[in-house]
């Protein structure tokens, strides 16, 4: 399991290694939306919150889907991933057909008028962020893996199995890691 930092870029999955026990990132799968010399930004895909979007964010009364914890940075900010960069201004393409952000008021209007379906958007509170060099150091410590991302992974609701399935999809020795207990010392 070589250092995979060089393969990391926007549009890739960042997967917490089994050794990463820090509570914010334990067994998480993140979508990286920005990765450059200045730092990195991503969103945790498998940490839904108890709140629904319609309960927590004004203007999105039609979205009866869970709000997600995007990460521990600026948890008072709302972010969204979506598939409708064709109609949302200022959206940044992360993967072919998958976009980050854009005009939130325009998004609200397009959802409320039925142009965009709620299933085409995922909302996050906060984000995961790393300063220049920080994530590279964490890779060297063995804290992270990478994998290719797909729109299906971003919008799945199989949160409980996302980490093990994503690790297992890497094949080889990763299959053993995917089946490891959460607290290996407790065996």
Swiss-Prot record:
> Which superkingdom does the taxonomy of this entry point to?
Bacteria
**What Pfam families does the annotation carry?**
DUF179
- Gene3D superfamilies per record: VC0467-like (3.40.1740.10)
InterPro entries, per database record: AlgH-like
> Which SUPFAM superfamilies does the record associate with it?
VC0467-like
Descriptive protein name: UPF0301 protein Cpar_0662
Family membership noted in the UniProt record: Belongs to the UPF0301 (AlgH) family.
Q: Which GO terms describe its cellular component?
A: cytosol
Q: Which HAMAP family match?
A: UPF0301
């Amino acid at each position: 399991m070589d250092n995979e930092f060089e393969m990391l870029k926007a549009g890739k999955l960042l997967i917490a290694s089994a050794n990463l026990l820090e509570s914010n990132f334990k067994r998480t799968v993140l979508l990286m939306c920005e990765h450059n010399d200045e730092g990195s930004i991503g969103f945790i895909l498998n940490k839904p919150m108890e709140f629904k979007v319609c309960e927590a964010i004004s203007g999105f009364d039609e979205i009866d889907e869970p709000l997600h914890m995007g990460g521990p940075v600026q948890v008072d900010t709302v972010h969204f991933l979506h598939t409708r960069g064709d109609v949302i201004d200022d959206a940044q393409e992360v993967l072919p057909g998958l976009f980050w952000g854009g005009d939130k008021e325009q998004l609200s209007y397009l959802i409320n008028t039925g142009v965009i379906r709620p299933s085409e958007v995922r909302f996050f509170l906060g984000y995961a962020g790393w300063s220049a060099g920080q994530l590279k150091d964490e890779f060297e410590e063995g804290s992270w893996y990478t994998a290719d991302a797909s729109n299906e992974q971003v919008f799945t609701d199989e949160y409980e199995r996302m980490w093990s399935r994503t690790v297992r999809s890497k094949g080889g020795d990763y299959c053993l890691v995917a089946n490891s207990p959460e607290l290996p010392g407790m065996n």
